[in-house]
Amino acid sequence: MKTIILFLTLLVISSSCTSIITKTMNSKETTYLDSPAVSPSIDQYLVDIHLGHSFLQGVMSFCYDCGKACFRRGKNLARCKKFVCRCTKSGIK
């Protein structure tokens, strides 16, 4: 009886430790899509932004992503039409 209780106790402790370890490892590997690019100077001068899209995504979702991409570059959204995203040349004022 004592061995069963000891075994179950060790099993619970080891499973809780592994869950804590995997939780911390997964949180370190998380990357965020809204974070700015590593080298923003490369695409800073681009006016047209080519985002990957699909027809299942829809125009509204594409234009939302277009506006977010312009904002990350410090530009205003000029036009989003027929899956073409255009930002203003001047920065946000």
Curated annotation (Swiss-Prot):
Keywords: Antimicrobial, Disulfide bond, Fungicide, Plant defense, Secreted, Signal
Annotated localization: Secreted
Top-level taxon: Eukaryota
The keyword Endoplasmic reticulum belongs to this UniProt entry's keyword annotation: no
GO cellular component, one term: filiform apparatus
Signal peptide: 1-19
Biological processes annotated in GO: defense response to fungus; killing of cells of another organism; pollen tube guidance
Disulfide bonds: 63-80, 66-85, 70-87
Protein's UniProt keywords contain Disulfide bond: yes
Family note: Belongs to the DEFL family.
Protein name: Defensin-like protein 210
